[in-house]
Amino acid sequence: MALWGKAHASATNKPKYLPTDENSDYNRGDSYATNDGWVMKAGTPASGNGNADADPEILVAIGGLAGVSSTTGLKAPTVTKMRFVVGNTATTDMTAGDGTQRILVEITYDEEVTVNTTGGTPTLVIANNDASGGGYGNHTLSYQPTGSTKNQIRFEKTSAGLGNTDVLTLGGSNIVLNSGTIKDTADGSTDASLVLSGLSAVAITVSS
């Protein structure tokens, strides 16, 4: 098995020796493709400094990897990972039972992306199976620039009605642009993929 890849639209191209643990300094999610190759995001623990504007560390040198158009390199940014971001407070840790919680998710791409909300704000629907019987229904999250960095973008609903034992699922619905845009930063014009259904769905259960 190759240690990394460069196939268009593959979710498994990133260097495989990088751990998937979010707490690791070399978390795979912080790796993405540029036209220099596979790099590690600047400003992360792996970079050795907190300067997010510094040049990223090149892990695997591959000229033209990201591409300069929709027909070169990786062609278009592809989603490689998605997750719920769980906090440690009463309204962010999914343990409020029957009450309101913040729902925050992070979508990771294999390339740097640029989100433009001038025409509208991208959204993402989180399914709720309503196991509690409270009738809270699905939740629509909106793009949140705070916490979004380079190849990772976040969607949030700050006050969502949830019931104890409700199961929330990420991945059943794709990103909706609502006249906003999510573009490949490498060329400035290629649309990033909005498809989440190619990955395994991620679920979280509300508790008390």
Model-identified regions with their sequence ranges:
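Non-catalytic beta-sheet/beta-sandwich ligand-binding modules that flank or precede catalytic cores
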Residues: 1-208
